[in-house]
Each structure stands twice: as C-alpha cells, then as structure tokens.
UniProtKB/Swiss-Prot annotation:
It comes from Rhodomonas salina (Cryptomonas salina). This is Large ribosomal subunit protein bL19c. Its main location: plastid. The gene is rpl19. GO terms for cellular component: chloroplast; mitochondrial large ribosomal subunit. PANTHER family: LARGE RIBOSOMAL SUBUNIT PROTEIN BL19M, RIBOSOMAL PROTEIN L19. InterPro entries: Ribosomal_bL19, Ribosomal_bL19_CS, Ribosomal_bL19_sf, Translation_prot_SH3-like_sf. GO terms for biological process: translation. Belongs to the bacterial ribosomal protein bL19 family.
Amino acid sequence: MELKVSLNPIHIKELEQNYINSNMPDVGVGDTVKIGVLITEGNKERVQFSEGVVISKNNNGLNTTVTVRRVLQGIGVERIYLVNSPKLKSFEILRRSKIRRSKLYYLRSRVGKATRLQQRFN
C-alpha cells in the first residue's frame, strides 16, 4: 500500500519560508554586485568573490535566481546564482543602474564602453 501525501500550495509556501535567505538585499536587474560564494576544496572551505552586472532575475519564491555577467580577459562570463542558497555567504550591491528592460541580454553583443549603464542615484 502506497502512502500518498498531497501538499497544498499554501503548505509549500509555509515550508519555503524557513529556507528563504532573510539578509539578502533587494537586488534588481542592472545592479553591479559583489557575490561571495563558499567553495570547498578538499577539506578546506573558502569564500570566492566575483563581481558583475545582474542581467536577469527570475523571481520564483525559494528558487529565485540572478544571472551575473562580467568580462574577464576579453571573454564574457555569465553565472547563475541561486539567491537563497546556503553557499552564498555575502551579496553586496556596489551600484545601481537606470534601465528600461527586465532582461539585459543585449549586453552580450556589446563591447567595451558600450556595455556601460547609466548610474541611478537614490
């Protein structure tokens, strides 16, 4: 005999609230951020920092992700971070930008000074 457990969406939301990272700043698309990720190498742990521009954000409750882009040595590098991951140790907003799009995928085809975004002062 199989035991079937059905969870209502209300119950799922309550369970997810326990795992949501509460010290996360309100990050938006176009923000330049510095992210510290916990890296395990053998039996040692260290925090690796990376910096870049948020080109997209997918709001999905516990599974919220941000895509961060940076050009390193002439090569564009994008990485998707799970915002509520326990591996994320620090998330700092360095500057905010004034944008009119929800996804900044057009930055992939831009080079040099064309990738700059207008800064927003609050």
